[in-house]
Amino acid sequence: MAAEEGGLNLTVSETLQSLLESYRRMQMPIQQYLSFILIPSGAFFVVTIVAAILIDLPMSIRAPIPLLGLLAFGAALFYPKILISQRKRQLNNRFHLLVTHMTVLATTNIDRMEVFRKLAREEEYGELANEMHRVVQLVDTWNQSLDDALRRRAKEVPSDAVSDFFDRLAYTLGAGQSLKDYLITEQEQIIQEYSTVYESSLDSLEVMKDLYLSMVLSMTFALVFAVVLPILTGTNPTMTVSAVIVMYIFVQSGFFLAIRSMAPYDPLWYHPPEKSSPTDERATKSFAAGVGLSLVLLFVSFGGMFGFSPVALGDIIPLVSEPLPLPMYAAIPITPLLIPGLVMRQEEEKVKARDGEFPSFIRALGATEGVKQSTTSMVLRTLRKKDFGTLTENINSLYKRLNMRIETSEAWRYFTAECRSYLIQMFSEMYLVGREMGGSPKVLGELIAENMNEVLQLRQQRKQATTTLVGLLYGITAASTFAFFIGLEVVNILASMSLDLETSSNFDVGTLINTGVYDIPLIEFLLIIIIMFGAMLSALMIRTIDGGHNMNTYLHFVTLTWIGSLTALATKWLVNVFLSI
């Protein structure tokens, strides 16, 4: 017992210490935060408590008032902690790319401070670029040495990986070792740290999947009870079902936000706003076609249902007769969204294939340039004849632009824009900058290829996690829909049986079961809503973990909705068949 109390005290102490540390690391002074945010929110909490005591209203209205004040005070109290956690995540997300970029710059003929200045101007690195800028400010403005500036920032950054890197770099530079030698020897350790963080994120997602499964099963049972129990208690089933659905939506949304915060940052796509590609054109056309057809089907289906459309679904879709089962009115109108989903799925596979070929290409390019001591266009003249899969066409386009004397940097930017790959864009930019500043092409090619291969191996693990999640969500959708409609159909059959009993005898069935409180079509409509909401959130979860294009969401959304709709129809048919025997 004493050990448990000691462990609890230690946990509370660690939490308080972590919270105080987050206050210390805020950009805003602590006194200013206390005066303008924390103390006013605490006063607001006290006011809500007093108001709940003094106001002459029913308890059901007064009770939530202090909860509003508690929410405001809790948000103000823990906001610095949340802010520091976000900064830590931003620092860790691109850390391996920044170190690789730093190594590329260090292999060139520029001063080590110029390396930090260039990285500070790279907006792509976000919070890491800000840290580089702070280091540069300490050196340029406050006349500190680079190693002293790094030690000072190591104490302030919330990321352990970045802090440790700054500490070791400061010690190495202070000892007289060159930045280039240190970074080349550190590459393997940095990638290993990134792999550890990446894999731990995937492990956390595995735990979240188990928790999500337990939550959905619990909420499914709650919803089934909300459908069935009113037949015995006589309460309004529409209210109980609506209450459970609202809770279901909040809990599912919370899990989605948690999964989004845990997923490793590893975007697949690169979207340059100033340069379009054939991929953009196909995406735009497929999106317009899918959304346009969905709107037409939506108008026809509901217009035919309510009588304000001259045609119905049965008139334009073969083998469909009116009236349709209610689940079909949810599934059929959104089916055309498969068009953009499938198109972007194909384009995404091409991007992944280009990513797989790029390490071989950049290694061959660097090695050949190093041996021949010639320009990139001269090397590409022979290199483009090799088979690099889907990347070959982009390499040919790069060669043609360089051969037309288009500026080298602009030709490479067109190359990355056509590839549409985030990694290819980042590493191509590093190679280009390294070559322009006199770096060894062979060293650059080997360095970039090795780092990209490590990231691609981690992506394979991410793909396996996504595949497992897809199977889990598809199975959960079918199982929960089956449970929903079993309860609804049992109630529907009991209601029809009670009517038969009342007409065939003088027995008052209402003393045993309360079927008159049910509005079956309305409850079925509510169940269809929760199926579609679950399909939407499940599709978003898959896209978040997969890291792919936003339009991939449509593919899983439509598929999950059809699974739910067909399961609902099959369940209703099976229950009627078995109970009629």
Residue ranges with predicted function:
Residues 1-55, 79, 83, 257-326, ...:
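Membrane-interfacial amphipathic helices
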Residues 1-23, 97-119, 149-153, 160-203, ...:
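Hydrophobic alpha-helical segments characteristic of transmembrane helices
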Residues 34-56, 65-74, 196-258, 297-299, ...:
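Bilayer-spanning, highly hydrophobic alpha-helical transmembrane segments
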Residues 37-41, 127, 131, 287, ...:
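Selective transmembrane-helix segments that form parts of the transport pathway or gating/packing helices
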Residues 62-154, 164, 311-417, 425-462, ...:
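Juxtamembrane/interface alpha-helical elements of multi-pass membrane proteins
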Residues 130, 160, 164, 215-223, ...:
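Hydrophobic alpha-helical transmembrane segments in multi-pass membrane proteins
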Residues 278-287, 355-367, 543-561:
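Cytoplasmic juxtamembrane regions at transmembrane-helix boundaries
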Residues 570-581:
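Juxtamembrane boundary at the C-terminal end of a transmembrane helix
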